[in-house]
Amino acid sequence: MRHATLYRYQLPMDSGVILRNEKLTQREGFIVELTENGRTARGEIAPLPGFSRETLEDAGLQAQALLEQWVKGHAIEWDAQHPSVAFGLSMAHYELEQALPEQGNYYVAPLCTGDPDELLPVLNNLPGQKVAKVKVGLYEPIRDGMLVNLFLESMPDLTLRLDANRAWTPAKALKFAQYVAPSLRSRIAFLEEPCQSPSESIAFSIDTGIAIAWDETLQEAVRDADFALENLLGVKTIVIKPTLIGSVYRVEALIEKAKTLGLQAVISSSLESSLGLNQLARLAHKLLPNEVPGLDTIGLFRAQLETPWPNSSLPVVALQEQSIVWRSESSL
């Protein structure tokens, strides 16, 4: 017996969340719920504004059409769907197959925002491997460089992951690097997408010795029918945001290929709700158990959805309180 429900959720965001220069006041998305043979599983479909090509409406319509096929017993062609739809539906399918472990990798790289004087004690108290993330490119590159230098200089055992979201011209990227001491640059694990083109980013890495990572470049490349990971040269790390990449099966294959190429792979969030974030933590535990995932985004929300994130004090809203967009009537 198969049954499916499609919910639409809305969650309030913290006032300071800005995506591609647009303020995000609430996060909207869908939760798909699949039931088969007495087992129920869920997945989150939430296109990321400014990053996903598909709109929320596009995703909802496609999800409903696929669910109508699924309850009739049809298989889903994952790679033919919008990435957010493929990921959310496949995650529910994956959980239904009992392929997703109960245990999750909740040791995440904390996202550093706010006053450095307040952050340093927090980072000092991190257990084990001290890895943190800093968003750069929002302010002047000199300020960013000085801040990164301060963190690395103050904590000799700290490693930083930086994300510029292609904000810099080559000149601005080099200006940033000038304010990070050469002796400290090796503790920048990677800098995601410093410049507006991959070739500029690679040139920056060669000039400065700062390792870079592909994020948007990977998202764009996987859309090509002839995509091959080995063609994405010049980096040692790929950042995988499943909502922007596609199905969980595609994510699995991408990680396996990265391993054969000697690339580091990191699973990262696309501002999923606590429900989706918990599933990403479980997926990270299964596929990359020794890698710190980039999932420290729950603090950007003002509420959680159904499944609370460990140690978060944010209020939790029930899935049943969200609107039902579609529900199957008959099933096999």
From Swiss-Prot:
GO BP annotations, alphabetical order: menaquinone biosynthetic process
Cross-referenced CDD domains: OSBS
GO molecular function: hydro-lyase activity; magnesium ion binding; O-succinylbenzoate synthase activity
One Pfam family from the record: MenC_N
Annotated binding of Mg(2+), by residue: 163, 192, 215
Catalytic reactions of this protein: (1R,6R)-6-hydroxy-2-succinyl-cyclohexa-2,4-diene-1-carboxylate = 2-succinylbenzoate + H2O
Active site: 135, 241
Keyword Magnesium attributed: yes
Keywords: Lyase, Magnesium, Menaquinone biosynthesis, Metal-binding
Pathway the protein takes part in: Quinol/quinone metabolism; 1,4-dihydroxy-2-naphthoate biosynthesis; 1,4-dihydroxy-2-naphthoate from chorismate: step 4/7; Quinol/quinone metabolism; menaquinone biosynthesis
EC number(s) given by UniProt: 4.2.1.113
Entry cofactors: a divalent metal cation
InterPro entries for the chain: Enolase-like_C_sf, Enolase-like_N, Enolase_C-like, Mandelate_racemase_C, OSB_synthase_MenC1, OSBS_N
Protein family per UniProt: Belongs to the mandelate racemase/muconate lactonizing enzyme family. MenC type 1 subfamily.
Role description: Converts 2-succinyl-6-hydroxy-2,4-cyclohexadiene-1-carboxylate (SHCHC) to 2-succinylbenzoate (OSB).
Protein's UniProt name: o-succinylbenzoate synthase
Annotated organism of origin: Vibrio cholerae serotype O1 (strain ATCC 39315 / El Tor Inaba N16961)
Gene this chain is encoded by: menC
